[in-house]
């Protein structure tokens, strides 16, 4: 059993992305599904699919790359877990981070749900910084 399933998910995505895999399988949870929905909406992944397996289910994530088969480039340059079980990182609405000077996104868990840093600025809320993606 893992102590941090979100870090495990991000690591699996990072490793599959580095190896130019088409897809990666993850154990499912509602929080992971919400994070994947943000990554899909922001254009970092192609899509994801929930597969029922009689237990908790599996999320199959389809990764996205730029260019043709010979000259592939990764869409996700970096993905980093920020708030961890041993050290939670919370920010107020005034301290919301800009990732890579606005070129990346921060995924924030707020009272309004799991949203990006840009949406949190619009909704004027702070929360727990889950991860950075660029």
Curated annotation (Swiss-Prot):
InterPro entries (alphabetical): Ribosomal_uS8, Ribosomal_uS8_CS, Ribosomal_uS8_sf
Keyword terms of this UniProt record: Ribonucleoprotein, Ribosomal protein, RNA-binding, rRNA-binding
GO MF, any single term: structural constituent of ribosome
HAMAP family: Ribosomal_uS8_B
Transmembrane in keyword set: no
Superkingdom to which the source organism belongs: Bacteria
GO cellular component, one term: ribosome
Coiled-coil regions listed: none
Quaternary state and interactors: Part of the 30S ribosomal subunit. Contacts proteins S5 and S12.
Protein family: Belongs to the universal ribosomal protein uS8 family.
Protein's organism: Kosmotoga olearia (strain ATCC BAA-1733 / DSM 21960 / TBF 19.5.1)
One Pfam match: Ribosomal_S8
Task of the protein: One of the primary rRNA binding proteins, it binds directly to 16S rRNA central domain where it helps coordinate assembly of the platform of the 30S subunit.
One Gene Ontology term from the biological process aspect of the record: translation
Protein name: Small ribosomal subunit protein uS8
Keyword hit for rRNA-binding: yes
């Amino acid at each position: 059993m893992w102590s941090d399933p979100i870090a495990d998910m991000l690591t699996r995505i990072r490793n599959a992305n580095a190896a130019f895999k088409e897809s990666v399988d993850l154990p499912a949870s509602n929080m992971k599904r919400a994070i994947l929905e943000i990554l899909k909406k922001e254009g970092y992944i192609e899509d994801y699919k929930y597969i029922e397996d009689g237990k908790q289910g599996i999320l199959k994530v389809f990764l996205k790359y730029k260019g043709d088969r010979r000259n592939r480039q990764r869409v996700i340059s970096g993905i980093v877990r920020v708030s961890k079980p041993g050290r939670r990182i919370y920010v107020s609405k005034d301290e919301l981070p800009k990732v890579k000077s606005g070129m990346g996104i921060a995924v924030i868990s707020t009272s309004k749900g799991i949203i990006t840093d840009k949406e949190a600025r619009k909704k004027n809320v702070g929360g727990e910084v889950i991860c950075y993606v660029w």
